[in-house]
């Protein structure tokens, strides 16, 4: 096997190899082939097959001369599609078939023996004697011909699989379909053998007679001529039909075609197969077939009966009967496979009788058809030739497997024949072209490009750039699924740095952090060598960073010394005397099982020997894999391969499963450079350390390592270390963000656009020349009984509308108008049928760009104006128009790897993004008297936490997260009321996984509560209790005004006040009044927290009296209005921290009113303990009820704090620890549908391995009969889980209800559900039918809704729906699939809006074949890649899954992006609007929020200098909009309208303060707190900043030091 990058290089390579073989007559051809099999594969390929050295040389000679002869396959992969293995039927048999392969290939022999033994159980004679005997007539008898073909075909298929030729589809011809069914996994070997023998025996027992005639005619021509007793047996090609039946009738038809000059051929058969003459055997055969149990195909399987992919009835008894009687639709099968993307057909059987039929059947397109065992050619040469033919045109072949067991060994062969061309420009006088031209020193090193000497010190810095493009060999160093720069590479970098300063010894080098390599991403490296000390030693460090905007990461550090180590021992005697060879024939396979997935460049280890405690190894640099050892001291791939011997030696002696990496190198000296073939000796160097001596091929010294220490690392630790080091890629989940856009009414000339017409008018033909037609979907409502039915009805209607529209070919726009089908963040999706219609319409948009616009609105809109905006999808809420953009989901805070002593803290920058994780060692200190240590599961977030994070808390801010819940880990002295294992809630004093707390401040969690529910109680209920009961001493019959009544403290205070007989008045924003009404308030007792109208309203309701108590958390004029509402003797309780008044001034201005600003901490531990007990008792007696809770993973704290700061929550916001979800799932049961599919199986294994789930229920229609179910269950059981595989059609409501009823009786509580089932039936919109929609909807919509209803009353922690990105972006040809998945997306939002667990994972493309991706060809994958979507591995998919669960937004788009492809589409103007926020734009200055303000001002002033006034303003407007977008959580500055008022954009007092903080840092100006309200739009603020920057200071509208008096987070109480 030879390959090259060009045709010229291929012939040159053949010439070099031919000359080498001729010059070395001792070379064994097997060794040559084995060595070539390990090389990299390029585009231009050739395979030479020969039985002798002479034949191989002749083949190489013809190839080198450009005239390839017999036994030589030459080709170049084009658009490689799917591969099909075809099994021939009766007539292909011949005496001796398979005998040569049986003797040459053990895999063929093993498979043949297994099949023959099974067949012999049913045959009257041993099959081997028949096939390899001398009686051809016996073999030709149907009784033996059919089993014989089955045996040879199954064994041939085993060879193909062993060689790595893995087909996408299989099909057979007549009895050959039984071999195909077995190959696809439908039939077990025992069942298939029984069936094939019975088939042949029963046919043989029929009376002889009848005729079969092949005629050159079409099926349509033959069909009218058929009469009684004769039929069509096979349609082998469009113009090749076999007639079968009574001899006279068959011959009569044949004679008619012969008379027309058509080719007619009488087949030599004993019976007329596939004809009416077969009917006497059918009944008995049906009884045999009924004993066979069919399974779901593991490969695509095409049916002879239908000519299409096997359907649900494939393999039934009736099917096999029909298969005997009905025609073989072989031509239809071949054509259907071509429509599925098949380009390569391999006939696996004796002869090549089907190749012609396939070629005739296929459309005139590129397709290769080869036969594996051609007649009149040695069988092994024929099989190898077939493999070579498909390989040269793109089908993967594992040539190393071909040579396995041959005894071949790797030998030195000529390296690649480079076709050298010069692409470098000749340096001119205009600029430097190398390091010297830039004033830098050149290194002449392959990894380091330049050296810089510090002029003011003795320090030296060496720089370089690494990438998988420039150093492709690095891509072969894969550890636990991650491409790592090898530890040996750091040694090479430091050795070169030592050479620069005259230090020949690495005294020590410790690896601090991995250097991860990502495709398409370059990495800068710097080796920093410090100044020499008195003894000449120098510190050395290696740093890396991904791009200019990232910080440097320390990867390694150590010390250099001057003197080299002593010369190592002599290894000239080789192999060493007395050393025993160690078998490493499967060495790299063993290493792969332990996480070392080394590619060819790192597979240089060729031999190992052992002598006592010593170990010896030989390594050869794989030059053909791009490992060039020149310009290196010791190539990292060579040194790394040396160390592989250690891994294999451990494997051989200890059966270790650890993955270990180099950690600390000591005493390293390089004695010679450029070695490509080395010998190595290993010896013990103390505890856990080894020494290494490396010599060249003559035994002379190359490298010495006095001591090397390795350390184990798991895949999880590696991922955590990569993340903590900032080395993770930016490929996290995406979310759909609806951003406000500006809409200008009127056309270009200011005139209004023509009015739109309705769909009814369009259908009636009365639409005239309207440019916009509107089809409005009537809302289906939300009745549970009608939801599924409404989805079917709506999608059917939508299909009819879309098909009519697209068929009309009108130059107009169709507007699909819905209400509640999509929504803003946090909104309920009230019309799930509309959600499904959006999915279908998105697919129609993708197929027909520019013809359809989707609009979802809450009020009447002008569709003509919106249709002209240029956005394909729009959402209108409250008069504001929004457009969707994909945006990276919020980044997770990085947690310390393997560290539990940490705490969430404010970062000090005045913004919520500054939240950080800080070490907290005090929680691990020894316990004092009365203390307990708690493993925290959940922490409540309060308003004061948000205030503290923004730097607004007066005085010393407390730790974030005052309250929480968890489990007691340890008790200190004098603790009597609590024990280890108790679940407790209370005041834990910080947001982290561990807390130490006084026992007085916690109490036990009530039975049946979750930790999140418990964490929501202490602060809010005790704050309300302390304020109302202790401070206000409120009494029955009095009245209280509670501001922010839907917040945590507000809802708690409402419950307590009512419990005590108090009349309650409450405020909230109007959007939350329905919540208040649901709490039992009438409108007379509800006020608006965004205006002061509540004062007048409540005075009127109370007939001018007012209220007795105010519980306040507002600021500014809201405080004054509330004070005016108090009666004489009234009590004003201030919980807020932003507007605290002077009590004496209040008393003077409001006679008789008592003003008290308070904090719960004033109560003291003893009183807090009493209140905790009292509250707990009221919960136990059900006089108090738990609050609504919104949970966030603590790693999403910035998003949670922002959610709370914007007053979007109802009840409490709670942060859960990363382990909380795993703990909940591990304690309960998780139900997975579709678990045997590609996605479901990966997630099932991940839940067990990563989350510790111990009870799994895998539901599918076929239960344990589903393909792969038994294997999956066994794997999960071995991993420690209890697994139940159940047969349940989840689309059947009664079946689902029954399943969950059973689970409630027999299993731990269900805590999680994953719905991963689904089916495909792809077609473009114009080809879809209602039936095809229903097929796809049933598996997704019915099933998901049934699961939703069955679990709505359960306390789930996870309800995950496996959706598809097709629903989000609109996938051409998948309108039904997009509709079904859009329903899932809407259902997840619907559940979250109802307070239930719910997330929809819109999966992108999985790299793993099978399941939903089985139908995709390489052409499909390439198209998807060009679109900007990259395939993800299972490891990458579960990382996205974990991140999505942590972020917990209703919709997570789980896909990897190809940024280069996105950029290319953007530059070509072909990037959909939805993706526009993901393409990298021209580089702009980014504001450094943590930078020095003075430097920011200076930099900004420099940018403004020299610009015209309008240009300055434009720049500043962009700056303000950028910071505003960051505060509002929008993707970019373009998502903020510069002329919209901040209040309308969504700003309130808190967010206004944050924006002011950001602008202060970005501009360097001292900005007043009221700047956002004094200048109400981004443009106005930019104008103000421009004046300040120019030195002009306008008159302020008020005192710049005054308090902000705008509405202050009206619904957020101080502790809620």
UniProtKB/Swiss-Prot annotation:
May play a role in phthiocerol biosynthesis. The active site is at 174 (for acyltransferase activity), 477 (proton acceptor), 640 (proton donor). The gene is pks1. This is Putative inactive phenolphthiocerol synthesis polyketide synthase type I Pks1. Residues 1588-1604 have a biased composition (Polar residues). Keywords: Acyltransferase, Fatty acid metabolism, Lipid metabolism, Phosphopantetheine, Phosphoprotein, Transferase. GO terms for biological process: Actinobacterium-type cell wall biogenesis; DIM/DIP cell wall layer assembly; fatty acid biosynthetic process; lipid biosynthetic process. Residues 445-605 are annotated as: Dehydratase. The keyword Lipid metabolism applies. Was identified as a high-confidence drug target. Disruption phenotype: Disruption of pks1 abolishes the production of phthiocerol dimycocerosate (DIM) on the cell envelope, but the production of mycocerosic acid is not deficient. The pks10 mutants show a major attenuation of virulence. Residues 1228-1409 are annotated as: Beta-ketoacyl reductase.
């Amino acid at each position: 096997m030879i390959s090259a990058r060009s045709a010229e290089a291929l012939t040159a390579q053949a010439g070099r190899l031919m000359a080498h073989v001729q010059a070395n007559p001792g070379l064994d051809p097997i060794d040559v082939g084995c060595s070539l099999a390990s090389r990299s594969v390029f585009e231009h390929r050739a395979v030479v097959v020969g039985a002798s050295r002479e034949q191989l040389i002749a083949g190489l000679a013809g190839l080198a001369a450009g005239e390839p002869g017999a036994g030589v396959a030459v080709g170049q992969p084009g658009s490689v599609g799917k591969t099909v293995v075809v099994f021939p039927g009766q007539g292909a048999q011949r005496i001796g078939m398979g005998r040569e392969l049986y003797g040459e290939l053990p895999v063929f022999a093993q498979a043949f023996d297994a099949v023959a033994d099974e067949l012999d159980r049913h045959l009257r004679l041993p099959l081997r004697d028949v096939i390899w005997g001398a009686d051809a007539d016996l073999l030709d008898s149907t009784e033996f011909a059919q089993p014989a073909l089955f045996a040879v075909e199954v064994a041939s298929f085993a060879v193909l699989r062993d060689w790595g030729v893995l087909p996408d589809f299989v099909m057979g011809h007549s009895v050959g379909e039984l071999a195909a069914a077995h190959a696809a996994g439908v039939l077990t070997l025992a069942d298939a053998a029984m069936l094939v023998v019975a088939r042949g025996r029963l046919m043989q027992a029929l009376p002889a007679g009848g005729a079969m005639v092949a005629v050159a005619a079409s099926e349509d021509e033959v069909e009218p001529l058929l009469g009684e007793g004769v039929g069509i047996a096979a349609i082998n090609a469009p113009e090749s039909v076999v007639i079968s039946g009574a001899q006279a009738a068959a011959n009569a038809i044949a004679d008619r075609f012969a008379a027309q000059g058509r080719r007619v051929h009488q087949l030599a058969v004993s019976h007329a197969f596939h004809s009416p003459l077969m009917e006497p055997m059918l009944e008995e055969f049906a009884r045999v077939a009924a004993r066979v149990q069919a399974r779901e195909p593991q490969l695509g399987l095409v049916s002879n009966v239908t000519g299409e992919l096997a359907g649900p009835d494939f393999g039934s008894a009736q099917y096999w009967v029909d298969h005997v009687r009905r025609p073989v639709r072989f031509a239809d099968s071949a054509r259907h496979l071509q429509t599925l993307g098949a380009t390569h057909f391999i006939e696996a059987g004796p002869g090549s009788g089907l190749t012609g039929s396939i070629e005739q059947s296929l459309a005139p397109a590129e397709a290769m058809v080869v036969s594996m065992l051609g007649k009149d050619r040695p069988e092994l040469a024929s099989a190898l030739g077939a493999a070579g033919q498909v390989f040269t045109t793109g089908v993967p072949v594992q040539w190393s497997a071909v040579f396995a067991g041959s005894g071949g060994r790797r030998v030195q062969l000529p390296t690649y024949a480079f076709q050298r061309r010069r692409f470098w420009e000749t340096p001119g006088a205009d600029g430097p072209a190398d390091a010297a031209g830039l004033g830098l020193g050149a290194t002449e090193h392959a990894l380091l490009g330049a050296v810089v000497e510090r002029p003011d010190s003795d320090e030296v810095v060496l720089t370089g750039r690494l990438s998988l493009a420039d150093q492709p060999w690095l891509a072969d160093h894969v550890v636990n699924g991650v491409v790592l720069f090898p530890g040996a590479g750091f040694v090479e970098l430091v050795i070169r740095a030592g050479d620069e300063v005259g230090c020949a010894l690495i005294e020590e080098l410790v690896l601090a952090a991995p250097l991860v390599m990502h495709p398409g991403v370059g990495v800068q490296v710097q080796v920093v060598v410090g100044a020499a000390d008195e003894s000449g030693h120098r510190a050395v460090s290696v740093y890396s960073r991904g791009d200019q905007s990232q910080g440097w990461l320390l990867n390694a550090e150590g010390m250099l010394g001057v003197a080299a180590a002593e010369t190592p021992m002599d290894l000239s005697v080789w192999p060493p005397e007395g050393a025993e060879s160690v078998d490493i024939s499967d060495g790299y396979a063993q290493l792969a099982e332990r996480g070392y997935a080394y590619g060819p460049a790192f597979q240089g280890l060729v031999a190992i020997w052992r002598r006592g405690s010593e170990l010896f190894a030989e390594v050869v640099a794989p030059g053909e894999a791009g490992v060039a050892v020149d310009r290196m001291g010791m190539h990292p791939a060579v040194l790394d391969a040396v160390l592989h011997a250690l891994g294999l030696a451990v494997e051989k002696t200890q059966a270790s499963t650890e993955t270990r990496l180099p950690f600390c190198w000591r005493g390293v000296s390089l004695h010679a450079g450029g070695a490509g073939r080395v010998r190595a000796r290993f010896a013990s160097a103390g505890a856990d350390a080894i020494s290494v001596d490396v010599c060249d091929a003559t035994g002379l010294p190359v490298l010495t390592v006095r001591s090397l220490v390795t350390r184990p690392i798991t895949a999880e630790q590696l991922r955590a270390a990569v993340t903590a080091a900032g080395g993770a890629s930016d490929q996290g989940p995406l979310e759909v963000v609806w951003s406000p856009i500006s809409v200008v009414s009127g056309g270009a000339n200011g005139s209004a656009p023509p009015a739109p017409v309705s769909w009814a008018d369009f259908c009636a033909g009365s639409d005239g020349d309207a440019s916009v037609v509107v089809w409005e979907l009537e809302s289906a409502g939300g009745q549970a009984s009608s939801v599924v039915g409404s989805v079917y009805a709506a999608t059917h209607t939508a299909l009819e509308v879309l098909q009519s529209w697209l068929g009309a070919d009108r130059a107009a726009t169709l507007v699909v108008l819905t209400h509640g089908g999509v929504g803003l963040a946090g909104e309920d999706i009230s019309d799930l049928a509309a959600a499904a219609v959006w999915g279908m319409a998105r697919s129609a948009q993708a197929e027909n760009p520019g013809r359809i616009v989707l609009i979802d609105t809450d009020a009447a809109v002008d569709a003509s104006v919106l249709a002209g905006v240029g956005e394909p999808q729009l959402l209108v809420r409250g008069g504001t128009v929004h457009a969707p953009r994909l945006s990276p989901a919020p980044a997770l805070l990085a947690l310390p790897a393997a560290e539990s002593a940490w705490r969430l803290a404010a970062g000090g920058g005045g913004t919520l993004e500054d939240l950080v994780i800080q070490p907290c060692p005090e929680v691990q200190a020894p316990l004092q008297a009365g203390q307990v240590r708690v493993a925290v599961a959940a922490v409540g977030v309060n308003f004061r936490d948000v205030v503290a994070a923004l730097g607004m808390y007066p005085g010393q801010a407390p730790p974030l997260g005052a309250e929480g819940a968890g489990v007691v880990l340890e008790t200190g002295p004098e603790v009597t009321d609590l024990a280890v294992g108790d679940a407790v809630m209370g005041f834990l004093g910080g947001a982290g996984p561990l807390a130490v707390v006084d026992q007085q401040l916690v109490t036990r969690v009530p039975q049946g509560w979750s930790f999140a529910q418990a964490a929501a109680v202490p602060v809010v209920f005790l704050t309300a209790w302390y304020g109302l009961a202790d401070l206000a001493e409120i009494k029955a019959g009095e009245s209280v005004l509670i501001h922010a009544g839907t917040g945590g403290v507000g809802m708690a205070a409402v419950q307590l006040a009512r419990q005590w007989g108090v009349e309650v008045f409450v405020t909230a924003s109007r959007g939350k009044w329905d919540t208040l009404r649901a709490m039992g308030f009438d409108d007379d007792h509800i006020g608006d927290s965004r205006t002061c109208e509540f004062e007048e309203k409540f005075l009127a309701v109370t007939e001018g009296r007012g209220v007795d108590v105010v519980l306040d958390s507002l600021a500014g004029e809201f405080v004054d209005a509330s004070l005016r509402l108090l009666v004489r003797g009234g009590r004003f309780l201030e919980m807020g921290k932003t507007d605290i008044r002077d009590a004496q001034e209040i008393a003077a201005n409001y006679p008789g009113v008592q003003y008290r600003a308070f904090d719960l901490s004033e109560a003291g531990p003893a009183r807090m303990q009493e209140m905790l007990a009292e509250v707990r008792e009221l919960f136990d007696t059900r006089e108090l009820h738990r609050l609504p809770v919104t949970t966030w993973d603590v790693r999403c704290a910035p998003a949670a704090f922002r959610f709370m700061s914007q007053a979007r929550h109802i009840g409490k916001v709670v942060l859960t620890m990363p382990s909380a979800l795993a703990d909940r799932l591990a304690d309960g049961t998780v139900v997975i549908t579709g678990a045997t599919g590609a996605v479901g199986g990966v997630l099932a294994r991940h839940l067990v391995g990563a989350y510790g789930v111990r009870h799994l229920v895998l539901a599918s229609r076929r239960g344990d009969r589903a393909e792969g179910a038994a294997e999956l269950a066994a794997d999960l059981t071995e991993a420690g889980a209890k697994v139940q595989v159940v047969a349940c059609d989840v689309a059947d409501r009664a079946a689902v209800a029954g399943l969950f009823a059973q689970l409630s009786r027999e299993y731990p509580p269900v805590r999680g559900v994953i719905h991963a089932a689904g089916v495909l039936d792809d077609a473009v919109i114009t080809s879809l039918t209602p039936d095809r929609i229903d097929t796809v909807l049933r598996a997704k919509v019915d099933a998901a809704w049934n699961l939703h209803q069955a679990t709505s009353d359960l306390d789930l922690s996870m309800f995950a729906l496996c959706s598809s990105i097709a629903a989000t972006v609109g996938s051409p040809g998948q309108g039904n699939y997009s509709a079904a998945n859009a329903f899932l997306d809407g259902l997840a939002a619907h559940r979250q809006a109802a307070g239930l667990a719910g997330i929809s994972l819109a999966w992108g493309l999985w790299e793993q074949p099978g399941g939903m991706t089985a139908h995709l060809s390489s052409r499909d994958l390439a198209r998807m890649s060009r679109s900007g979507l990259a395939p993800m591995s299972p490891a990458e998919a579960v990382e996205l899954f974990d991140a999505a669960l942590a972020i917990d937004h209703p919709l997570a788009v789980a896909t990897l992006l190809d940024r280069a492809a996105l950029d290319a589409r953007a530059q070509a103007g072909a990037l959909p609007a939805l993706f526009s926020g993901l393409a990298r734009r021209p580089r702009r200055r980014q504001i450094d929020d943590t930078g020095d303000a003075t430097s920011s001002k200076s930099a900004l002033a420099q940018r403004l200098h020299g610009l015209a006034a309008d240009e300055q303003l434009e720049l500043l407007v962009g700056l303000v909009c950028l910071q505003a977008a960051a505060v509002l959580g929008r993707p970019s500055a373009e998502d903020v309208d510069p002329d919209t008022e901040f209040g309308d954009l969504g700003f309130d007092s808190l967010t206004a303060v944050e924006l002011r903080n950001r602008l202060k840092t970005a501009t360097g100006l001292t900005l007043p707190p009221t700047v956002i309200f004094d200048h109400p739009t981004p443009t106005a603020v930019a104008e103000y900043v421009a004046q300040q920057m120019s030195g002009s200071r306008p008159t302020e509208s008020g005192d710049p030091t005054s308090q902000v008096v705008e509405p202050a987070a009206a619904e957020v109480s101080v502790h809620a």
